[in-house]
């Protein structure tokens, strides 16, 4: 099961949380569609800002959006001008009050979405796919990853027949739920066609915290 299912969804409720946090008794379809529109708008608007994740949280007529990016300065702009303009555009798009929170990604080489996007852009720039995969795995391991697997599929180097190639370093235990596996799939659009880039990064294990139980009091009357 762990080899086939999306690793992010497989760990929801265990070591991962949902990227959309809201409840809709009515109008679920419209709310979900609005979430997709918000994410699409942000990804297109900030396509050069290394945005990895967009979290959406709703409360009454208010939307709280957390943008995880490796380039917070580009998103915020001088004096907060860029993020304020983005907030006004999202207000107009949704018709609701929008609050934006910028979260900086400290180690972009351990973020599967950013790594996959970097490889895809190199493929579009006609960089050799093996070189792009090897450099990505080396940077991830130097950044502290326990393991990484990169797979590219399509007409690699313009070959007549599509195929798959992968590069792996370290351990990537997909069936271990406590293993923090980050996964992403990005498409590269080249002159030879579309090439899929998949990245799995093992960032270590997340162990559940246990609360210490208070010591039991001895029974009255002493030991028997």
From Swiss-Prot:
Entry-linked SMART domains: KH (SM00322)
Record GO terms (molecular function): mRNA binding; rRNA binding; structural constituent of ribosome
This protein's UniProt keywords: Ribonucleoprotein, Ribosomal protein, RNA-binding, rRNA-binding
InterPro entries, alphabetized: KH_dom, KH_dom-like_a/b, KH_dom_type_2, KH_sf_prok-type, Ribosomal_S3_C_sf, Ribosomal_uS3_bac-typ, Ribosomal_uS3_C, Ribosomal_uS3_CS
Limits of the KH type-2 domain: 38-106
GO cellular component term, pick one: cytosolic small ribosomal subunit
One of the GO biological process terms: translation
Keyword Protein biosynthesis: no
Domain of life: Bacteria
Family, similarity comment: Belongs to the universal ribosomal protein uS3 family.
Function: Binds the lower part of the 30S subunit head. Binds mRNA in the 70S ribosome, positioning it for translation.
NCBIfam families according to UniProt: rpsC_bact
Complexes and interactors: Part of the 30S ribosomal subunit. Forms a tight complex with proteins S10 and S14.
Name of the protein this chain belongs to: Small ribosomal subunit protein uS3
Source species: Lactobacillus acidophilus (strain ATCC 700396 / NCK56 / N2 / NCFM)
């Amino acid at each position: 099961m762990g080899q086939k299912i999306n690793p992010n969804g497989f760990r929801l409720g265990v070591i991962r949380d949902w990227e959309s946090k809201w409840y809709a008794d009515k109008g679920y379809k419209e709310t979900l569609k609005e979430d997709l529109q918000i994410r699409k708008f942000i990804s297109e608007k900030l396509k050069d800002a290394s945005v990895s994740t967009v979290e959406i949280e709703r409360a009454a007529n208010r939307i709280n959006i957390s943008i995880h990016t490796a380039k917070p300065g580009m998103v915020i702009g001088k004096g907060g001008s860029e993020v304020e303009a983005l907030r006004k555009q999202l207000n107009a798009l949704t018709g609701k009050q929008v609050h934006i929170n910028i979260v900086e990604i400290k180690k972009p080489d351990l973020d599967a979405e950013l790594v996959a996007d970097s490889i895809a852009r190199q493929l579009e720039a006609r960089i050799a796919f093996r070189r792009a995969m090897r450099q990505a795995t080396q940077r991830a391991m130097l950044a502290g990853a326990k393991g990484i697997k990169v797979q590219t599929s399509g007409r690699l180097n313009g070959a007549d027949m599509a195929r798959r190639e992968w590069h792996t370093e370290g351990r990537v235990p997909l069936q271990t739920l406590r293993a923090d596996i980050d996964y992403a799939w990005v498409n590269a659009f080249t002159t030879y066609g579309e090439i899929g880039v998949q990245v799995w990064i093992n960032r270590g294990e997340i162990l559940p915290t246990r609360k210490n139980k208070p010591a039991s009091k001895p029974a009255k009357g002493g030991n028997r």
